[in-house]
Structure formats: structure tokens, C-alpha cells
Amino acid sequence: KNMPVNAMAAGADMASVSMHKSGGSLTQSSLLLTGPNVNWEYVSQIINLTQTTSASYLLLSSLDISRRNLYMRGEASFGKVQDMAEYAREEINSIGGFYAYGRELKNGSSIYDFDVTKLSVYTRDIGLAGIEVYDLLRDEYDIQIEFGDIANILAYISIGDRIQDIERLVGALADIKRLYSKDPSQMLNTEYIAPKVVVSPQKAFYAKDESLPIRETAGRICSEFVMCYPPGIPILAPGEVITKDIIDYIIYAKEKGCSMQGPEDPDVNNINVLV
């Protein structure tokens, strides 16, 4: 109840469910749901071509136990999760300097609904990138959240959390603001840059390319992915034009501590571009 419509109810043919994040099963376990228009036997046949022949029965049993628990107690459990998440939102917003996004963002069009169990917090107003707050929470307060990016952190409230965990998170954020806040005017203003696609990703990926220092790639066409992980959303993809703003964004993300993935050069000092 009081949650966004799920993928299958919205008419999806197939949907993956990360049970290890929200349902209480062990890490690496998830479910693949199939709708009435999909032949699940055929899907299983195709999956068997690539998946291991030595399935982990520890993971499978944890999925089954979690499935049963959600069937028996799921509505009550997620009701508590929503209450804890809304409480966390109120407390974090009362600190000042942070903004925990909520249902007030819904506008009926570009933001159709909002999942309150995802506690996303804007951090730039205290002069810290989300990844910096993420690192502080992990290293100084022993709190592991989902991820941090240039301007936000994401904490995933699940059925395994308690109100004491929420209090620890809120207290840590208040402490971080008091001890580590900086002048926000030094922060990069851009959160996301929409690149221009000029070549299909497939053609760009397989085309002849060369590696250039990142500062020399402005105006060239990228032939590889560049992304911060987590969350793993590409900053650049094959076939997209590299601009100065994108270069500045990548360098800024590196300086703030984002884990960069995708390029052939793991340090992202060079980027592969089409010849």
C-alpha cells in the first residue's frame, strides 16, 4: 500500500526484483518475474545457456524464505519501512543544509510517483558532494548506504532496518554538517549533462579509435563508456560527442572520489575516441 505501481502491474512482460535489497534475502539473489505474454519455459531455457550449473542453494533458500516472509508479513513490514523512511525525511530536513526528497516532488507528469523507501538526500548545500558524504558515513560512522554521486546520497530503507539505524544515520548527517561542511559556492553546478549522439553506439564501439588525454578530447566522438559506479549511469557512451562541460564533469567526479568505470584507461586520464 502507498507505494508506486509495480512493473508487472504496469504491464511489463518481465521484471527483475532485487530481493537482496528490499526483501531480506542474501546479497546476489534476485527474482525474474514473467508475465502472461511470456513463455517462462523458453526464458528458463535461454537462461540455462549462460548461468552456472552449480547454483547456490544458500541463495535459493534465502529467496524462498524471504518470499514466504513477504507473503505472510509483507504488508505490515513495508508499512513500518515507509514510516521509518518518512521519519528519517523529517529529521534530516530539520538539520538544515540537507534536503531529503519526498512526495512533494510529484507533479503528475515528469515525476509520476515517488518511492518513499528510497531515502535520497541532496548534499550540495553543505558544500560536500554526495560521494564525500557517502565516504564519511562509511569510514567515520560505520554506516554503509547505497551510493553517493555528485550532489546526492541514497539510503535504501528495508525490512531489515530498525528505528535505531535511522537515528544513527540522522545523527551522523548532523555531525557531518557540523564538522565537515564547506562553502557550497565551490561546488560544480551541473548535475547531469545530456550528450549529443551522432553515431550509433554499436558502430562507435566497433569503429577504429585512438586514445587521447582527456583534456584533448573536446569535440571528438567517444568510443567507450564512462560512468561513475554506483549508480552506473553513463556520463558518456559510444557515439556521443565529448564537450568541455562533460570533461570538467568527469574530472570533478574523479576529484571528489567517484569510482570511474567503463574506459580502457582505469584512471580515466585518457579516453578512446573515433579516428
Regions found by a protein language model. Name each.
Residues 48, 64, 68, 86, ...:
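Short amphipathic alpha-helical surface patches that mediate protein-protein
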Residues 14, 241, 266-270:
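Long, hydrophilic "mature protein body" segments
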Residues 93-262:
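Conserved C-terminal alpha-helix-loop-beta "cap" of PLP-dependent enzymes
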Residues 1-104:
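Conserved PLP-enzyme active-site core in the AAT-like
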Residues 259-275:
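Charge-dense polyanion-binding interfaces
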